[in-house]
Amino acid sequence: WEPDHELTDFIPDKRRRGYDMRKFCKLLLDPDSFFELQPKFAKNLVTGLGRLDGWSVGVIANNPMFQAGALNPDSCDKAIRLMCLCDAFNIPIIWLMDVPGFNVGRKVEHERMLFKAIRMVEALCNLSTPTISVVIRKGFGLAYQAMNTSGMGAWGFYSWPGAEIGFMDPDVGVNVAYSNKLEGLDKEGRETERQ
């Protein structure tokens, strides 16, 4: 068995560099089989249908090119729609995860972020169709759980080499834990201190 280098080389080595998950889906699935649903709505999440080795599958994937792939109320609704569609026709779902978390702030709170996140997790828990999840680069916080981890019922759970999984992004954790110490340092000192 030899890995597909076009697929493995597609993901950038630098963790902050974005990539287009739509292109990744087209590489992963059978040639010319990926059909994206709602491509102009909630661009931070890619949903679609395709074929993998001839089998029909649904795809739910974070898109790091938009809002770093973070989930917001619209992307939660988009994921729920695809889950309901695939569940109705017993189409397995592949989850491709590269999620830094949920968006936060006044705007998303007014858009009922918490309610939409809970609805997404509820829809996930009610799925009866087979699912597998792959952490491509990162999975942090509650958004990691909402993207179908093994604890949420995934039939298979895999991670890409170098994937990061945790409660929060390590850089954010350092800023939270050492904010007082970092305030007194200049920019060069901060980078040195983080390492």
Model-derived regions: residue spans:
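Ligand-binding clefts of soluble mixed alpha/beta catalytic domains
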Residues: 1-195
